[in-house]
């Protein structure tokens, strides 16, 4: 009788035990598939220690009700979640997402991915994620505060600077972090770095806003350099017009490249003179307007409705908008136009088919869990500053970020070579992230 491989066994059991959680199934499958070469070399030991079963089962899952009173005096009830997935290499770390789509499966998918991303940073942080199905859109400041205070009143029992340090994610920005920090401090009577993404007046870090976009470019620059290319003088296409896209564009231009596009949910800009970052920030961060305003204010810019940035000829493509935004057709257009590298700024922006097509055609492809890890890396640097009760200058944080991103690239590169998948940075990232966690778990026994 053909026995199933250990990876297949674990996946089959995971799907059976966690029904109706497709996002979690997809994430576990993607990671475990790429870990096959490592698992095969250690199959007997891993199986005996149930290492993969322990890896895919969170250490702790917390689900709670969140009652709060709206502006009309009506009591509303939401559901809160915190999945503490793995603490082998440090306290749990991962964002809080407030969005109507949030359910346990989505939080598990994000928490599982976070284990490997956090491991790759080289910093001592474990994996976790949390959130609620609360929708901050259309709510008043008072309602958001009431919700955040109720949410933290329960969550505060499970977190702490040396236990679990949440951060922001979709629907959770500086305002929400502030309200939650205030409530934690009031209930626990502790002023500690229990959350990251804090304001600069109460323990936040300089360069955190820029971190994901800047980090993406430091990673891309190193990937190009190690493959005989130079970022300077290259034409770059960026999608998105949010935090990641803006600071990726700024850093690309500082490093001598020319960024010719940005996009938002309604359309995109082609600017052959190069995107004017200050104008883009004015339109998006100050006015919170559409890109039509950018085009109206700049002669060299053309505005196009709908999607289409990937049709523009470029050397480097940086998807920085949202998940599954770069499809197979887009990948074909990029390859036909001679693209050298694609690096993910958003989480999972490239579909599986598009990723495979790019890799088959010799394009250097950087997976988000490596190339956009600058955000969580800088969160860990914020934790360091809180522990030391001091704050570093912008340049100090930026220099540390650059070093971390270069190290992440080499960790992915080395792991891809070690297992015979040279230049496959997707496999490299998963293996490099896994090896550290697996070694730490093994050293700490069956816990």
Model-found features: residue ranges?
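Adenosine-phosphate binding glycine-rich loop
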Residues: 3-27, 223-224, 335-447
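Glycine-rich phosphate/diphosphate-binding loop of Rossmann-like nucleotide-binding domains
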Residues: 196-199, 204-313
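Glycine/serine-rich phosphate-binding loop and adjoining beta1-alpha1 elements at the start
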Residues: 99, 118-232
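Flexible, glycine/charged-enriched surface loops at secondary-structure junctions
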Residues: 22-25, 41-48, 122, 159-168, ...
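General beta-strand structural signal in soluble alpha/beta enzymes
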Residues: 109, 163-167, 190-195, 238, ...
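Structured beta-strand/loop patches that form or line metal/cofactor-binding pockets in enzymes
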Residues: 45-74
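Rossmann-like adenosine-cofactor binding region
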Residues: 267-365, 370
């Amino acid at each position: 009788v053909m026995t199933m491989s250990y990876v297949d066994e674990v996946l089959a059991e995971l799907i059976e035990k966690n029904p109706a959680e497709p996002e979690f199934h997809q994430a576990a499958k993607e990671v475990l598939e790429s870990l096959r070469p490592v698992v095969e070399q250690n199959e007997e030991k891993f199986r005996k220690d149930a290492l993969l079963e322990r890896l895919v089962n969170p250490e702790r899952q917390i689900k709670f009700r969140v009652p709060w009173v709206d502006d009309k005096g009506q009591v509303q009830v939401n559901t809160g979640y915190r999945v503490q997935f793995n603490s082998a290499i440090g306290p749990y770390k991962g964002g809080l997402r407030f969005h109507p789509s949030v359910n346990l499966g989505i939080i598990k998918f994000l928490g599982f991915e976070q284990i490997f991303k956090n491991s790759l940073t080289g910093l001592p942080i474990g994996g976790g994620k949390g959130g609620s199905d609360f929708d901050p859109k259309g709510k008043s400041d008072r309602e958001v505060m009431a919700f955040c205070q109720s949410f933290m009143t329960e969550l505060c029992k499970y977190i702490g600077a040396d236990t679990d340090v949440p951060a922001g994610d979709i629907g959770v920005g500086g305002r929400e972090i502030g309200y939650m920090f205030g409530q934690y401090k009031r209930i626990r009577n502790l002023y500690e770095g229990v959350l990251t993404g804090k304001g600069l007046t109460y323990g936040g870090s300089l360069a955190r806003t820029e971190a994901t976009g800047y980090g993406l470019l430091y990673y891309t620059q190193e990937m190009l350099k190690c493959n005989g290319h130079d970022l300077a003088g290259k034409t770059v296409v960026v999608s998105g017009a949010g935090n990641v896209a803006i600071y990726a564009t700024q850093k690309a231009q500082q490093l001598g490249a020319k960024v010719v596009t940005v996009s938002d949910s309604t359309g995109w800009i082609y600017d052959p003179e190069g995107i004017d970052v200050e104008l883009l920030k004015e339109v998006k961060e100050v006015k919170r307007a559409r890109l039509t305003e950018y085009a109206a204010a700049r002669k060299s810019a053309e505005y196009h409705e709908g999607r289409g940035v990937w049709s523009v000829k470029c050397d480097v493509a940086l998807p920085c908008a949202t998940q599954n935004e770069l499809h197979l057709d887009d990948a074909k257009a990029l390859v036909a136009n001679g693209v050298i590298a694609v690096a993910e700024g958003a989480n999972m922006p490239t579909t599986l088919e598009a990723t495979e097509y790019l890799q088959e055609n010799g394009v250097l492809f950087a997976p988000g869990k490596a190339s956009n890890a600058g955000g969580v890396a800088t969160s860990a640097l914020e934790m360091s500053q809180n522990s030391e009760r001091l704050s570093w200058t912008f340049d100090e944080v930026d220099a540390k970020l650059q070093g971390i991103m270069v190290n992440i690239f080499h960790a992915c590169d080395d792991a891809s070579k070690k297992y015979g998948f040279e230049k496959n940075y997707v496999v490299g990232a998963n293996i490099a992230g896994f090896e550290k966690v697996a070694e730490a778990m093994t050293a700490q026994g069956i816990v």
